Each structure stands twice: as structure tokens, then as C-alpha cells.
Amino acid sequence: MKKISLEELKAYEAPGHYGMTAMRVHGKDETGAQKFWVGLSTFLPGGGAEYAYEDDPLEKVYYVLEGEMTVRDKQGKEY
């Protein structure tokens, strides 16, 4: 087990994302995790990400700490 503090996180450019800051909390490079990774993203109003669920075999989980988030599927349906 490895403890990571917020001050240790480093921002990175997330492909297909805009108006946001992405930081990886746990993953291969950060803590040695091999089968998953955990990120922390902060989106500005109007920020977002392109639809990329078919190109990525990883499942995604979003937990909104503050504000709200709209997800649109490939057909444009909002959730």
C-alpha cells in the first residue's frame, strides 16, 4: 500500500479532454497498481471530454464531488 497526498499529484494532458485538469492518483507509475487506475479531474464550466467509450476497454466510473455533470451517449441522449 502506498499513501498519496493531494500535494504529490501531477497534472497531465488527457487526450480528448478540454477545459479541465486531470491528475492520476493511483496507477502503474504512481503506486504500482496494474489492473486499474484512479484519477482526479476538475472541470471548468463548459469543459468536457469527447465520447470515447468504444475505443477504450476500461470501464469508467465518475463520482461528482461538487456541481453537476451531463453525459451524452453516441446518439446524443443525456444522462
Language-model-derived ranges and their functions:
Residues M1-W37:
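A short, N-terminal "cap"/entry segment at the start of jelly-roll beta-barrel domains
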Residues L6-L9, L40, L44, L58, ...:
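Generic detector of leucine side chains in alpha-helical contexts
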Residues R24-K28, G39-D56:
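Conserved short histidine dyad/triad with adjacent acidic residue
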